[in-house]
A protein has these predicted regions:
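Outer-membrane beta-barrel porins/channels
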Residues: 1-177
């Protein structure tokens, strides 16, 4: 070890292709139903090269080998007689990172989001929206350290378990004019 020294470096990250399709249907009395599907082309993310400006350090290559991922989202909204809008939703998201690249820096994993919400019209053009989301996943094994040599597979270092639970509360005031 020794003192950390400031140094320059560069990398390039190409964002994945994405395709989404969705629809909403309001043909039922007071109901709006919606659904969408997203595909994200993460399979093109094979490695991340970090080029250091100090020639002695050279380039560090992190192997990623991501998979394509997808998400499905479903929602419903009911407008009551007092024009309050009651909402419920679900989103399921598939992880892109393979087990050998899951780390504390990016503990990517499959997850489910469950939501409820309420829209209250206060005056003409002014609405108060409140929502709650619960994010859950089943947990996922991942590594705590990088392989120390190319002959060590990242998946053999999967000695950590990552879980995620989140409670998200949102309140907003919407003005329409």
């Amino acid at each position: 070890g020794g003192a950390l020294v400031a140094q320059g470096g560069s990398t390039e990250l190409v964002h994945p292709d994405q395709a989404e399709v969705g629809f909403a249907y309001d043909g039922f009395n007071r109901w709006l139903l919606s659904a969408d599907y997203a595909w994200i082309g993460w399979a093109r993310f094979h490695q991340l090269d970090i080029h250091f400006s100090n020639p002695a350090l050279g380039t560090v290559t992190n192997i990623e080998d991501y998979n394509n991922s997808s998400a499905i989202r479903l929602g419903a909204q009911y407008t009551a007689h007092n024009n309050w809008q009651w909402r419920v939703g679900f989103a399921g998201v598939a992880a892109a990172a393979p087990p050998q690249t899951v780390t504390p820096i990016l503990p990517d994993q499959d997850r489910s989001n469950y939501t409820v919400g309420l829209g209250i019209p206060l005056t003409t053009g002014l609405t108060l929206d409140a929502a709650y989301a619960y994010v859950w996943n089943p947990g996922r094994r991942g590594r705590l350290a990088n392989p120390t040599s190319p002959s060590i597979s990242g998946s053999t270092l999967n000695d950590g378990v990552y879980t995620l639970f989140a409670n998200i509360i949102s309140i907003s005031l919407k003005a329409s004019f």
